[in-house]
């Protein structure tokens, strides 16, 4: 069973320390790839705790940005973090905005978790004006070293549990997704980020507090399993001593609406 339709759980703070350290630098490069610039109006679908939203607000201003996020907790975080921002607590397949409401509609690190990815892409295209840009990006399979280490725990301690979804995690499948949705001038790219850490605990502690895909449900582990999991995790990272860096690599796609 894959992690289709996943809604992340855990505190927003833990998520930011877990995946936000990757999604924040990714957002800047993704927005560059899309060509986000004033005076555009943009939508962030599956906004999470706001990594991409923050980059869009920085470039366009809060009045020109809207966000869709199905998690009640994360939607509340978005409203607190960006006062006055148009935040709707909805999934990507059910966007409430009218046709042609935006110049650009983006979905960062979400398409693989949707129940209906093709339907969501069509929704992004619908709310984007003709000639506007629709784009998404997703971590490649084994593209995030930290997630590979978590998957090692799953394989060794919980082999019968859910496995991470693998579709829409490469340029070819993303291109096909967009072309079949009727988008034009489809282009793909790969984006790589690097994150610095000082200790293994700096990464492990938020990892065990955040639910969602990419690894085992470590929050339900017994103390003995947690100890085993941490040892496996450290081994998978190469038993680092002192500071170390981990890479993340994403596939990205953009297309023109209408």
Features from the language model and the residues they span:
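Conserved Class I S-adenosyl-L-methionine
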Residues: 2-8, 22, 49-51, 166-258
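A short glycine-rich, Lys/Arg-flanked "PGG" loop and its adjoining helix->strand segment in the class I
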Residues: 118-133
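Conserved class I S-adenosyl-L-methionine
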Residues: 1-40, 51-55, 59, 72-77, 133-160, ...
């Amino acid at each position: 069973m894959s992690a289709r339709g996943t809604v992340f759980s855990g505190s927003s703070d833990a998520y930011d320390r877990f995946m936000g350290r990757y999604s924040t630098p990714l957002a800047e490069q993704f927005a560059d790839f899309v060509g986000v610039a004033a005076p555009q109006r943009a939508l962030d679908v599956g906004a999470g705790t706001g990594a991409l939203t923050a980059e869009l607000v920085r470039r366009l201003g809060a009045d020109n940005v809207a966000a869709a996020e199905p998690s009640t907790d994360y939607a509340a975080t978005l409203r607190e973090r960006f006062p006055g921002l148009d935040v709707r607590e909805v999934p990507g397949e059910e966007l409430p905005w009218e046709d042609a409401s935006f110049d650009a509609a983006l979905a960062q690190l979400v398409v693989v978790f949707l129940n209906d990815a093709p339907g969501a892409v069509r929704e992004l295209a619908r709310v984007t004006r003709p000639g506007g840009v629709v784009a998404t990006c997703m971590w490649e399979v084994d593209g995030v070293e930290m997630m590979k280490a978590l998957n090692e725990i799953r394989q060794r301690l919980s082999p019968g549990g859910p496995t991470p979804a693998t579709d829409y995690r490469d340029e070819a499948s993303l291109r096909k997704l967009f072309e079949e949705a009727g988008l034009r001038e489809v282009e793909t790219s790969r984006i790589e980020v690097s994150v610095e850490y000082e200790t293994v605990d700096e990464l492990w502690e938020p990892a065990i507090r955040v639910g969602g895909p990419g690894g085992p449900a470590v929050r339900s582990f017994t103390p003995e399993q947690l100890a085993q999991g941490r040892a496996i995790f450290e081994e998978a990272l190469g038993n680092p001593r002192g500071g170390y860096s981990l890479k993340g690599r994403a596939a990205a796609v953009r297309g023109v609406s209408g």
